[in-house]
């Protein structure tokens, strides 16, 4: 061998030395610091210290398991070998003629010293992270050093006619080879050095991406452990089995950083600024990958060109083999870059952007003004305006569940815009080089004709997407409201009507989806036809100009066109995602720009109102329906009890909300003491001495907000447990006795919004939360409404004014003024939005205002202190105070079993998605024939694409002569049989068939997509209906125990996947499967050996995919499950927003959301990690197949250039087709998880809808007969009614009393057949209701619950949801419940005599102009929140009156109204029900409510302990009812009511 010397060679080596010196500076500095004793580790302070960084802390076990010793010793050994070889070569160069190599060899010797110095540095550096960073330098040092001996060996070939060369062989050559080998091994060893021990955060290991070596990181090898664990522990996998996210990937850190950079920037600009490093890497890598993607085409051109030359010079294959090697290296490099690009954009962009936006939406929601108290103005009857959507809590959930996902998806794919442009430019340059500018211009002209159509359809598609989002919001919002009010709907037997309404919204949504899909189909046609027609036109013009078409030109051009086609074919999805992202970002922007709740506190000592006009946020002062409090001038005494009273709807709750800063101050000012922030409170350091913070606020809402947690967790509300205070709180709030009846005491899980508690218990838990809190200011909204007399007095004396209530500022809204009057310090009387009177009790009494209120109580013939119920017998007989309360369960956990969970955990299947799921999806829409047609379309499309390439092979293999014979190699079998096909045809003949095939492929390609879309929409339509029906008809027990977030997850996220992804993924999978089939067919046509190789690689791919799918399925299921808590937390927090903010806990709930989003992100992160693990290995396998195909083509001399072009054009697609095909299958399996979850709900157990149809007029009378009734909530639970027997004759009014847990509410459920009899019977109107059809039964009865349920819409839509009654019937019902006065009805177009003639001066004072109930078109906001609690109860009562049932059940239905209104309502109820063959059952706490009834049913332990007339029960010597009356404190008053009745 000979080496040519020159100045350029010496300069190159000198530059290399400088690079090596730069690479070695790190090791030199490390050794120098170590020698001078100044070496300090960044993370480890000593050998015994545990490693810690921002991600987490290492454990002793992980520290012991971590080691990089063998890597360092191997590096030292290889460095020594290199040094020995370099030293030997240096000595040899001292002997002529090798002395001419003195400079390069001595430079190599110098480099060997640097390598040795690096090896020493690995032992001198104590920090593992620093050693890892040093390994990066060492890798480049080794890699660059190798280039020198490689260059010497490569240039050692002796060029003919040159004189300046030397002989290089023998020892010198072998020493160079040894150095190259040692350098390669050293580079590999550097890649194997781990970075750090595994670190832990919150008790869980952190993701190991940055714990392992560079090799592990770039090959995703750190996923192996989790993959194997998932495969072996499918049934035990949960979110806690997954590693924690790194610090930079945790939601709190991401959101904090995002908010810092956002400022006043637009959201798009903020995302760019926050993620510019990742975006820059994305764009650079994508551009690099774009350039690399054309490398195989260049190599293909080189191979085909060399094969064409092989005919003239047989045996000259050197250049061909060089192109084969180049092809293999380019494919491998491209595979690695592509895999890393997709990992980067998902892990560093898609997931973080989703986390940031979800957190931002929630954090903003926690700061937004609560506008749900203000109704939207409908655009017309039944219309839903945009304002209503903005005020919907469900719309906010959609922003995080759907819109944030769409924006993050676009962040994942946006780089394809840049790469598409780059591919277009590079493709154009290559095509100009291959076929000339005229041919390319012809193709571009044909493609340009579609641009106007493309622009028009794109605009239409964008509009359709906006319509689709709006339609989805409307459907989801309605569904959310229905689920919240499902109990009322089931009681009213209106499941079908509401299902029809939801189905109507769903149909409108699917119509828009179909319109968007049609537009998208046109775009698909354009994007398929453009590259196909581009290639057809370009090659046709080229052939016409040149008269021939060579294989190298044709197939290379075709390969470029295929790349262009692949790029352009992704544009429909890219444009779809881009347009969706723009629409979604606009929606998020609108939410972010919504007004926020401002700071309302200042440095004052007491709460002051100075001539303030107050209204709910979002309202307008001039709108009649927007209630306004005017001229409020108040000063609440510190540490005193202030009582706010007034009639129903006078603004009492609005006044409380204004203290909390939840209202808009139109004029004047409100001053509230400033409370310390959570960080300033130091709750963990609280002691009894400093427990109360005078300026902190606690709030008890009119609708108590209860978390889906245990009783204790609801009371503590995040505060530390203080045993004595906790027990005192339970006693003061009257909860001690209730907890003793719960199966798990205060560890009882009480379900979403306290569904497992009675109304009174929910109120007392909410009050206990306020009592236990550290707040010095307690703001309470009528805590006595749902309490019986004794419990109310107990709470008043021991809670409100007891030890825990004293020395705190207490502001209370109540209708029970008489109860609170003795200890009231400040009294406020409201009337029609103004201050009727204010001052001390004495001042207000002297002015007569308080006397008026007390007179109303007198008129109502009731007073809380005169009331009693059976609930209190045990209190009276044995209450011993807080000291007698048992230690809470948490204090002795070992003595208890694990508490039962009321809410059920979401189920998760394991293993592969069953074929039954796929079959069910396909069969649901009754469009099986369309699926078959689509499948045939994919097969035909592939056949056309193979046929097009085959025809091109025939064309390029034909002789130039017009009538010449053409020999074509149709197949290459084992017997090497060659079949000659004799063809004659002109150039136009070839062109005509080629263009015809191209056009046919465009039509079939579009048709298959359209068939898939139609079939998918049909399946989605039916699946939605199939899941909606059982959910609406599920037993109440299931609806109560399944979190609403889990149900909504099915109807939002899962349905979104079904609507938008499953059909597309099926289409993509079919495309890739047919592509692979086409490639295999092409391989068979050339050589069976290629088929064998392809099958081997496919088996390897299937093995890898089986490992991947075993883990990916479970992770995807976990991801779906992890989303439900996010949605549940959204809904729960928005429901309790006022309570959360009043307690100053908004930031706490934001942190809770961070944790839930992180758990979801962990599943998404690992799902994509598994995807990349598979993708890298698949693309490497594809690169091997393509390279082997090229080698076989070059090796076999009998294969012509045209046949080689044919097979290579498909082989180049194998890499992409296999990897994307398996990725599509994985995505389909993960998307089908949504189908699996939806199908799970289609098989829910539903209530039996069968049964006999009663006569049309049934019940003609309201007689109820209960015989020995035994019912329970579940077969495994004990009975709640045990042998209950009683009879209600028609026309009777029956009161039901009993302590909590006596079975009163269970009786109501049994009457409606929500609880099926285990024994006994219930006869209504002479028929056994157990044998009746449920709808027929429930539609003939009516119940008014304690918690009223209203739906957003209008007054009419709530009174008469399905337009079955006239306006006057509705107005009459409103008049009967005294929401309208007689004078109001006179202003109506027509007037009918009201059923009740009860009017009073109080009624006549209502101003018709300010009464929203005077118009049936008056808007009702979501949940009826623009009405007071009392107004909502009255509206529900009016709704029941409209239905005119024969049997009416009231469950303390007027607990939230003032006493006089209650008296008026009770009088109306008595006039409407319990007369004229109808019956009335009232479950009541106020004894005066039922004291004059015909019968009293006293219940205890599920039995009727007494049943008879009030007089009979009162005269029973030892009866329960008599005990109630005697212990009431006002025995004479109750006796007067009872005896006057007779």
Curated annotation (Swiss-Prot):
The chain crosses the membrane at residues 5-25, 74-94, 103-123, 134-154, 173-193, 284-304, 325-345, 417-437, 522-542, 544-564, 927-947, 987-1007, 1062-1084, 1089-1111, 1173-1195, 1200-1222. Residues 312-580, 932-1230 form the ABC transmembrane type-1 domain. Residues 881-905 are annotated as: Disordered. Its main location: membrane. ATP 2 binds at residues 1298-1305. GO terms for molecular function: ABC-type transporter activity; ATP binding; ATP hydrolysis activity. ATP 1 binds at residues 646-653. It is a multi-pass membrane protein. ABC-type transporter; part of the cluster that mediates the biosynthesis of a highly modified cyclo-arginine-tryptophan dipeptide (cRW). This is ABC-type transporter avaQ. It comes from Aspergillus versicolor.
């Amino acid at each position: 061998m000979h080496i040519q010397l020159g100045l350029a060679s010496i300069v190159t080596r000198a530059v290399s030395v400088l690079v090596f010196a730069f690479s070695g500076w790190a090791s030199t500095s490390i050794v120098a610091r170590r020698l001078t004793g100044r070496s300090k580790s960044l993370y480890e302070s000593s050998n015994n210290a545990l490693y810690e960084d921002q991600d987490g802390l290492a454990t002793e076990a992980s520290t012991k398991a971590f080691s990089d010793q063998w890597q360092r010793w191997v590096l030292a050994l290889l460095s020594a070998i290199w040094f020995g070889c370099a030293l030997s070569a240096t000595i040899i160069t001292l002997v002529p003629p090798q002395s001419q190599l003195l400079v390069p060899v001595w430079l190599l010797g110098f480099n060997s010293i640097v390598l040795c110095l690096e090896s020493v540095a690995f032992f001198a550096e104590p920090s593992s992270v620093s050693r890892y960073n040093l390994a990066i330098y060492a890798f480049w040092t080794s890699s660059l050093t190798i280039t020198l001996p490689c260059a010497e060996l490569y240039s050692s070939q002796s060029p003919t006619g040159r004189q300046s060369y030397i002989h290089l062989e023998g020892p010198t050559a072998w020493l160079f080879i040894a150095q190259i080998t040692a350098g390669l091994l050293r580079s590999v060893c550097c890649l194997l050095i781990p970075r750090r021990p595994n670190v832990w955060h919150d008790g869980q290991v952190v993701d190991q991406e940055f714990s392992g070596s560079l090799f592990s990181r770039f090959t995703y090898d750190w996923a192996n452990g989790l993959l194997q664990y998932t495969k072996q522990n499918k049934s035990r996998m949960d979110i806690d089995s997954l590693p924690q996210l790194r610090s930079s990937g945790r939601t709190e850190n991401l959101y904090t950083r995002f908010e810092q950079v956002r400022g006043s920037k637009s959201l798009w600009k903020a995302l760019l600024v926050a993620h510019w490093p990742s975006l820059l890497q994305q764009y650079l890598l994508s551009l690099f990958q774009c350039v690399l993607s054309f490398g195989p085409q260049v190599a293909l051109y080189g191979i085909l060109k060399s094969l064409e030359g092989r005919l003239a010079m047989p045996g000259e294959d050197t250049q061909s083999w060089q192109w084969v090697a180049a092809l293999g290296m380019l494919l491998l490099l491209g595979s690695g870059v592509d895999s890393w690009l997709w990992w980067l954009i998902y892990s560093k962009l898609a997931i973080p952007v989703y986390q940031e936006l979800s957190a931002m939406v929630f954090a903003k929601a926690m700061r937004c003004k609560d506008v749900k108290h203000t109704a939207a103005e409908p655009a017309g009857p039944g219309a839903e305006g945009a304002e209503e959507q903005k005020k919907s809590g469900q719309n906010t959930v959609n922003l995080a569940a759907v819109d944030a996902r769409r924006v993050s998806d676009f962040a994942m794919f946006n780089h394809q815009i840049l790469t598409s442009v780059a591919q277009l430019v590079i493709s154009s340059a290559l095509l100009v080089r291959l076929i000339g500018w005229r041919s390319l211009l012809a193709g571009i002209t044909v493609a340009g004709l579609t641009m106007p159509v493309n622009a028009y359809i794109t605009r239409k598609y964008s509009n359709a997407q906006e319509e689709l989002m709006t339609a989805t919001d409307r459907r989801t919002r309605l569904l959310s409201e229905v689920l919240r009010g499902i109990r009322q709907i089931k009681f009213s037997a209106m499941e079908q009507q509401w299902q029809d309404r939801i189905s109507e919204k769903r149909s409108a949504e699917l119509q828009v989806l179909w319109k968007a899909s049609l537009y998208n189909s046109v775009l698909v046609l354009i994007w398929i036809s453009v590259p196909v027609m581009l290639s057809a036109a370009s090659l046709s013009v080229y052939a016409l100009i040149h008269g021939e078409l060579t294989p190298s030109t044709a197939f290379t051009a075709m390969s470029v066109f295929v790349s262009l086609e692949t790029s352009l074919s992704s544009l429909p999805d890219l444009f779809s995602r881009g347009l969706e992202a723009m629409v979604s970002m606009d929606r998020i922007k609108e939410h972010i720009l919504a007004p926020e709740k401002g700071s309302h506190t200042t440095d004052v000592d007491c709460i002051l109102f100075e001539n303030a006009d107050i209204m709910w946020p979002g309202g307008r002062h001039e709108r009649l329906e927007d209630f306004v409090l005017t001229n409020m001038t108040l000063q609440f005494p510190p540490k005193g009890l202030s009582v706010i009273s007034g009639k129903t709807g006078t603004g009492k709750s609005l006044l409380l909300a204004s203290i909390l800063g939840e209202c808009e101050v139109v004029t004047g000012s409100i001053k509230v003491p400033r409370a310390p922030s959570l960080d300033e409170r130091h709750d963990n350091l609280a002691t009894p001495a400093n427990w109360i913070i005078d300026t902190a606020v606690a709030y008890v809402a009119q609708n108590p907000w209860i978390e889906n947690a245990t009783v204790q967790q609801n009371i503590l509300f995040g505060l530390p447990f203080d045993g004595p205070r906790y027990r005192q709180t339970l006693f003061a709030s009257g909860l001690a006795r209730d907890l003793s009846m719960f199966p798990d005491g205060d560890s009882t899980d009480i379900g979403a919004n306290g569904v497992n508690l009675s109304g009174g218990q929910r109120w007392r838990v909410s009050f206990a939360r306020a009592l236990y809190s550290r707040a010095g200011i307690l703001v309470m909204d009528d805590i006595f409404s749902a309490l019986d007399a004794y419990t109310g007095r107990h709470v008043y004396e021991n809670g409100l004014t007891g030890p825990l209530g004293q020395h705190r500022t207490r502001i209370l809204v109540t209708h029970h003024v008489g109860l609170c009057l003795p200890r009231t310090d400040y009294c406020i009387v409201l009337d029609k939005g103004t201050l009727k009177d204010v001052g001390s009790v004495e001042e207000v009494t002297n002015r007569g205002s308080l006397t008026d209120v007390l007179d109303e109580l007198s008129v109502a013939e009731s007073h809380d202190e005169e009331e009693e119920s059976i609930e209190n017998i045990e209190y009276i007989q044995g209450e011993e105070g807080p000291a007698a309360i048992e230690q809470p369960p948490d204090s002795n956990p070992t003595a208890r079993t694990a508490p039962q969970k009321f809410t059920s955990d979401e189920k998760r299947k394991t293993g592969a998605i069953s074929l039954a799921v796929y079959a069910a999806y396909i069969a649901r829409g009754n469009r099986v024939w369309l699926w078959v047609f689509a499948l045939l379309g994919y097969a035909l499309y592939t056949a056309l694409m193979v046929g097009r390439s085959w025809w091109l092979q025939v064309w390029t293999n034909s002789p130039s002569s017009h009538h010449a014979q053409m020999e074509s190699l149709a197949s290459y079998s084992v017997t090497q049989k060659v079949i000659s096909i004799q063809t004659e045809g002109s150039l136009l003949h070839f062109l005509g068939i080629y263009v015809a095939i191209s056009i046919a492929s465009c039509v079939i390609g579009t048709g298959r997509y359209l068939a898939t879309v139609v079939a998918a929409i049909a399946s989605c339509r039916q699946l939605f209906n199939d899941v909606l029906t059982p959910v609406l008809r599920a037993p109440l027990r299931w609806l109560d125990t399944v979190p609403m977030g889990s149900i909504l997850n099915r109807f939002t996220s899962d349905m979104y996947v079904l609507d938008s992804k499953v059909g597309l993924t099926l289409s993509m999978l079919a495309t890739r499967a047919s592509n692979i089939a086409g490639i295999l067919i092409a391989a068979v046509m050339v050589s069976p050996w290629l088929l064998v190789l392809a099958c081997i690689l496919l088996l390897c791919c299937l093995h890898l995919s089986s490992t991947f799918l075993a883990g990916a399925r479970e992770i995807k299921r976990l991801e779906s499950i992890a989303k439900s808590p996010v949605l549940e937390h959204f809904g729960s927090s928005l429901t309790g927003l006022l309570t959360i903010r009043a307690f100053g806990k908004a930031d706490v709930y934001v942190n809770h959301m961070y944790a839930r989003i992180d758990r979801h992100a962990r599943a998404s992160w690992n799902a994509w990690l598994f995807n990349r693990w598979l993708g890298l290995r698949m693309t490497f396998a594809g690169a091997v197949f393509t390279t082997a195909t090229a080698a076989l083509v070059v090796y076999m001399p009998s294969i012509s250039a045209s046949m080689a072009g044919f097979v290579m054009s498909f082989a180049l697609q194998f890499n992409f087709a296999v990897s994307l095909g398996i990725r599509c299958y994985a995505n389909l399996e993960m998307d089908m998880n949504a189908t699996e979850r939806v199908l799970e709900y289609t098989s829910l157990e539903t209530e039996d809808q069968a049964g006999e149809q009663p006569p049309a007029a049934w019940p003609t009378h309201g007689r109820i007969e209960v015989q020995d009734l035994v019912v329970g909530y579940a077969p495994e639970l004990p009975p709640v009614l045990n042998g209950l027997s009683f009879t209600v004759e028609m026309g009777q009014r029956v009161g039901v009393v009993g302590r909590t847990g006596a079975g009163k509410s269970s009786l109501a459920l049994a009457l409606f057949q929500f609880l099926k009899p285990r024994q006994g019977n219930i006869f209504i109107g002479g028929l056994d209701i157990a044998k009746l059809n449920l709808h027929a039964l429930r539609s003939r009865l009516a119940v008014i619950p304690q918690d009223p349920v209203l739906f957003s819409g209008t007054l009419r839509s709530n009174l008469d949801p399905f337009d079955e009654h006239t306006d006057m019937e509705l107005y009459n019902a409103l008049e009967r419940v005294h929401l309208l006065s007689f004078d109001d009805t006179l202003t109506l177009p027509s007037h009918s005599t009201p059923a009740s003639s009860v009017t009073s001066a109080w009624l006549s004072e209502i101003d018709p102009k300010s009464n929203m109930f005077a118009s049936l078109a008056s808007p009702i906001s979501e949940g009826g929140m623009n009405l007071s609690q009392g107004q909502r109860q009255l509206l529900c009562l009016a709704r029941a009156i409209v239905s005119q049932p024969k049997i009416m059940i009231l469950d303390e239905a007027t607990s939230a109204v003032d006493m006089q209104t209650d008296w008026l309502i009770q009088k109306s109820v008595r006039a409407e029900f319990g007369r004229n063959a109808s019956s009335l059952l009232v479950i009541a706490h106020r004894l005066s409510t039922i004291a004059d009834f015909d019968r009293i049913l006293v219940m205890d332990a599920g039995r009727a302990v007494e049943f008879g007339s009030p007089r009979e029960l009162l005269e029973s010597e030892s009866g329960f009812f008599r005990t109630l009356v005697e212990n009431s404190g006002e025995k004479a008053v109750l006796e007067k009511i009872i005896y006057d009745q007779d």
